[in-house]
Each structure stands twice: as C-alpha cells, then as structure tokens.
Curated annotation (Swiss-Prot):
Protein name: Germacrene A hydroxylase
Record-level Gene Ontology MF annotations: germacrene A hydroxylase activity; heme binding; iron ion binding
Keyword list, A-Z: Endoplasmic reticulum, Glycoprotein, Heme, Iron, Membrane, Metal-binding, Monooxygenase, Oxidoreductase, Signal-anchor, Transmembrane, Transmembrane helix
Gene3D superfamilies noted in UniProt: Cytochrome P450 (1.10.630.10)
Organism encoding this protein: Saussurea costus (Costus)
Main location, first listed in the record: endoplasmic reticulum
EC identifiers of the protein: 1.14.14.95
Length: 488
C-alpha cells in the first residue's frame, strides 16, 4: 500500500529527529535530576491542578532536594532541603543575588525599582541600606507602636459592637486593620483614598504569584497581549499611580522631629540626597512594597495562627491563659505587656513554620555560570527555594505536618534565617528586609484577638471541621474567609 503524503512527512520527520539525536555531540555535563518533560511547556504539566509549593514539594520528594524544572522557556533549579539552602544562600549567595524580570515587576513596580524586585547592584545596595538604617530599622518600627495599639483597639471595639455570639469575618477585619496600620505608618493619619488604595493593592496581589504564562515564555511578547495580562496590569498601574500621586501631593510633610516621620516623610527627606537621589517613581515603588507586601503577609499569618489554634483547643487554651494571666484584666493591650510571653512567641513561630508568608520565597536568578556539586548551572537560571518544603522536612521536624508550638521550647532557632531548616523570611542578601515590621504587625493583633475573646466555629461545628484549604497568590491565603463566633 502506498503511503499517504501526510504519513510520509510524519515518517521523514521522525527519522530526521532520531538522526539528530543520534549524531548530536555528547555532553559531559552532569545534569540535575528532573521529571519527564514535554516539548514547549517543559515540566509545567506536572504542576497543573496543584498549589505550586505543594506540587514542587511532591516532585522534590521523588527527584531530589536539588532538581531541575524547565518551566516553559525558563530553566529553573529548585531547592527543597536545609542542606542545599545553606549551600546556595551562603557559599553562592552573591551568585544568585539577582531577581528574574517579570511582567508584573516591569509594569506595577515601576520597572523593577522597588526593594523586592530591583536587580542586584549599586541601586539595590543603596535601597537595602535605606531600609536597614531608616525605613525598617528597629527604632522606626518601634516608633509606630502607638498606632498599632490604637488600630488593634479599634478592631476590638468593632467586634464588641457587633455583639457576643454573632459571626465575625475575621479575614476581612484583620486585613483592614493591618492595611490601616501600614497606611498610617506610610502616609500618616487618614488618607482620603485608603479604601480604593487597599482594593487596588488586593487586585495586584491577585495578579501575582504562581507561574504566569507571560513570565514562563518571556520572549513570546504576543502572549503578554493574548493573555490579557499586560492590559490588566497597565490598567491597574494607571489607577495606582494616580492614587499615589494624589497622596504625595496632599501629604502635609513633617515639621517636627525624625521620630514622628512617616515612611513617606523619610523618603521625601532623602529624595534629593546627593549620595543617593531617588526619583518620584522610585519613591512610589518603595511605598508600594511597604504597604502591599506587608499587608498581605501579616494578615495571612494572623489568620493562619487563629485557624491552627481553633483546630488545636489545647494550644488555644494555653496561649489565652498566658495572655490573661500576664495582663490581669487590663483593658488595652500594650506591646510591652506581651514582649516576654513565651507561648505566644512559640505559636507565632510554629504558624510561620507551617504557613510561611512566601512559601516559594521570591525567586532569584543566577548572575553567572556556577558549578554546584558537579552540576553546571547556566547564567540566568532561575532559583526557587521551597521554604514550605524545608519547614516541613521530616528529617528535621518530628510530626512535621502537625501544629505543635512546644517544638520550639528551649530551641535556639529564630525567624531570622540563621538556621536553614527554618526560613520563614528567607535568608542571605535577599532575605525579607521587613521581618521586624511584619512580626510587630502579627504579635499585637494576634494577642488582642486572643486576649479579649473566646472563639468558636459558627452553627455548632466542631473544631476539626474548619476548612484549611489554601489559595495561592502573592502569599498563601485561606481559600475561604475565617468566620468565627466571639464570646466575651
């Protein structure tokens, strides 16, 4: 039987491909382990239908704690163990100090000029210095104590006014409270467009996270338009830019001491510094970091802490007893009242272990070719450190999936990235610079919510019926809002 034209072409193509495979030069390079891949999309099919941090963790358990993934056009190495995290984030930290370019960073973050996405170099080093010495110093974080206490008290009053025994949407209330705290820290009391600003930030966070088609096929610019991503981000950015311009224009400035400066005051004071001048867009990009990233991560952590405590009545009873014994019936909670509460600290540490704010941290990018344990890593290879997997590594953590705050008792482990089995804020040069501010915005709100109220699920549901399903975005949030019934 004669072969059809189509069959002939197919046979010829197969023969040609096999010939090319057989005759291509043999490489002596040692290749990282990886799953089987498909043409064009690489390994993306392994992650379809999963939470990215969980899907990548499952692959690592099969292919190793240092593995390769081809995500579309982007060659990526994934680190899922303390051993490899320490190797890369210490020995090779500067080699992997860059950030990969993203469409979101280009449009929303004013061409990647914020602290989070700025490429490694002199500009980033100066931004880091600005954060360390001015914006996010211990002294500056402390200066916002009174507004944290005031906004926490406002939340307590709102819950009390709603009435004992009536369900409260804690997700919405916590997000609003922390957004207000950060808004006041950034801009001062009472910006006119705060609600609109908060909604825009929420939309940005919804557009961020996961593996976006525009970022895994960066050379295919038509996909940016075909997916609608560029148009959506451009529209969001236009609204955002107008709002921040209005906020800056209406900002009264600071005529008193540095101790009363808002974050915007600090940047406007330093904007025309001879040593390190900032453009108007630089200021806006940094402000967006302070407000956007801080609101999402802190509110998510408070929500997850309460969720875990609801599911673990023993721990809930213990932390509430500690708070109520220490405060002895006081009306308002002050930060100095809770600084030495050990079990509250354990609860926060354990929450950050199980629910790190950024489970895949922020991806890095290789700045030059490097050899890792005999594996050749090419320039511009993307690095993902799966903190979610590291924090649940059964080799380092007994009953790793269980919420057990006591595991941190008498432990030297801190949240600051010195121990590589526990990296809630990352480690190395690109570690989250806002860890101190983030912790302050978790500790006091959580203490107030637990001290003033007892909580239960609505409709008589038992504690183990609480839905803990995740939703992936810029951070990992609860998929459903945390709605609980207070009593007081």
């Amino acid at each position: 039987m004669e072969l059809s034209f189509t069959t002939s072409i197919a046979v010829a193509t197969i023969v040609f491909v096999l010939f090319k495979l057989a005759t291509r030069p043999k490489s002596n390079k040692k290749l990282l382990p990886e799953p089987w891949r498909l043409p064009i999309i690489g390994h993306m099919h392994h992650l379809i239908g999963t939470m990215p941090h969980r899907g990548v963790m499952d692959l690592a358990r099969k292919y190793g704690s240092l593995m390769h993934l081809q995500l579309g056009e982007v060659s990526t190495i994934v680190v899922s163990s303390p051993k490899w995290a320490k190797e890369i984030l210490t020995t090779h930290d500067i080699t992997f100090a860059n950030r990969p370019e993203t469409l979101t960073g280009e449009i929303i973050a004013y061409h990647n000029t914020d602290i989070v996405l700025a490429p490694y170099g002199e500009y980033w080093r100066q931004l880091r210095k600005l954060c360390t010495l001015e914006l996010l110093s211990v002294k500056k974080v402390k200066s916002f104590q009174s507004l944290r206490e005031e906004e926490c008290w406002n939340l307590v009053q709102e819950v009390k006014e709603s009435g004992s025994g009536r369900p409260v949407d804690l997700s919405e209330n916590i997000f609003k409270m922390i957004a207000t705290i950060l808004s006041r820290a950034a801009f001062g009391k009472g910006i006119k467009d705060q609600k609109e600003f908060t909604e825009i930030v929420k939309e940005i966070l919804r557009q961020t996270g996961g593996f976006d088609v525009a970022d895994i096929f960066p050379s295919k610019k038509f996909l940016h338009h075909l997916s609608g991503k560029r148009a959506r981000l451009t529209s969001i950015h236009k609204k955002l830019d107008n709002l921040i311009n209005n906020i800056v224009a209406e900002h009264p400035g600071n005529n008193s001491s540095k101790s009363n400066e808002t974050l915007l005051d600090v940047m406007l004071r330093l904007k025309d510094s001879v040593e390190f001048p900032l453009t108007a867009d630089n200021v806006k990009a940094i402000i967006l970091d302070m407000f956007g990233a801080g609101t999402d991560t802190s509110s998510a952590t408070v929500e997850w802490a309460i969720s875990e405590l609801i599911r673990c009545p023993r721990a809930m009873e213990k932390v509430q007893a500690e708070l109520r014994q220490a405060l002895k019936g006081k009306d308002k909670v002050k930060e100095e009242d809770i600084q030495d509460l050990s079990y509250l600290d354990l609860v926060i540490k354990e929450t950050l272990r199980l629910h790190p704010p950024l489970p895949l941290v922020m991806p890095r990018e290789c700045r030059q070719p490097v050899n890792l344990a005999g594996y050749d890593i090419a320039n511009k290879t993307k690095l993902i450190v799966n903190v979610f997997a590291i924090n649940r590594d059964p080799e380092y953590w007994k009953d790793a999936e269980s919420f057990i705050p006591e595991r941190f008792e008498n432990s030297p482990i801190t949240v600051m990235g010195a121990e590589y089995e526990y990296l809630p804020f990352g480690a190395g040069r690109r570690m989250c610079p806002g860890a101190a501010l983030g912790l302050a915005n978790v500790q006091l709100p959580l203490a107030n919510i637990l001290y003033h109220f007892n909580w239960k699920l609505p409709n008589g549901a038992s504690h183990d019926q609480l839905d803990m399903t995740e939703s992936f975005g810029a951070t990992v949030q609860r998929k459903t809002h945390l709605v609980l019934v207070p009593s007081f």
